[in-house]
């Protein structure tokens, strides 16, 4: 309340500074005033914060079996990797939900684990190129409806050197979340080519390894969980710019790489070395299986530092795709490549048909090139380019048939014209 003789015009909101005449209502407290506009703003802030916690608590986390079944619809093969990823992702988001849930004593043992903090379990994905590592992670993020960012480890360097700082990875996640930091803090970051930042030798080097061990050291904190300062425009940090603060404690990191040569390290440890004429054949047949036997000590010999390996407790592998798997990838999943091109042709009112021989030939070419599933789209583009160039200019074509000859020998595809009905003569 104002003192006697004090002008009521001097009464102002203690928060926004507006006078009593500028607002609808001014509420007095012990020595302070607050206007109706500030009260409304405070209510909005409280509601937003409560909604964030409520959304996280009410988020219906799919069970591992449901995650696995969803991956089955889009990704061919790699069942062991799907199971490992489904369990790891489920446990990660269950851990986040438990952190936001109210304390309770109904834990089956009298609530004795209320003070236990569950550590984050990041994932290391090992396997040859073109086997679906990136696609697995993308599909997981789509199922969970969380922000997802992909980064390339080869572009990263230690702070102060030419290249990208590790914080730029976090900027990609923030951008994927439309700069909603709270949402980004529960996202997934996929770092590819992680094997390319292995140190040059097993023993620590005297010279500075800015793109190998230096990057591993720089990644340690954000992998474990820290509040990082991210330049909003990317690039290098400088002291006079503003930063976005993001807590990486609940960000799931999936790091992946081909790790070429790791099978030899595993083989030397397990004593599985071939001798004589059968050696190459023996190695080739067991190379895919050897990745599944990887141990932390093998990764240490490969060039990852112990602290980095320790922050990737979940290690899973993917294997090379065989001919049957490549054929299935072309036609079976919900968003199979063949279905995508059929939809594009359908927009022009044309049906696109592949016979079995064509699919077999495309799979064989991908195997010959050694590009795995990644090479399938490139082959399809090469095969369909002449048709996609001419077809929009033609209105007489009803369907296009792609055969084995078209794929292997560059033959012209079969063009089936529209059927025109003849008019009956009078």
Curated annotation (Swiss-Prot):
Record's function text: ATP-dependent specificity component of the Clp protease. It directs the protease to specific substrates. Can perform chaperone functions in the absence of ClpP.
Keyword Zinc (UniProt): yes
UniProt superkingdom: Bacteria
Gene field: clpX
Coiled-coil stretches noted in the UniProt entry, renumbered to this chain: none
Lineage, uppermost ranks: Bacteria, Bacillati, Actinomycetota, Actinomycetes, Micrococcales
Disulfide-linked positions: none
Recorded GO CC terms: HslUV protease complex
Name of the protein: ATP-dependent Clp protease ATP-binding subunit ClpX
Claim: Protease is one of the keywords in the record: no
Chain sites annotated for binding ATP: 128-135
Record keywords, A-Z: ATP-binding, Chaperone, Metal-binding, Nucleotide-binding, Zinc
Domain ClpX-type ZB: 1-54
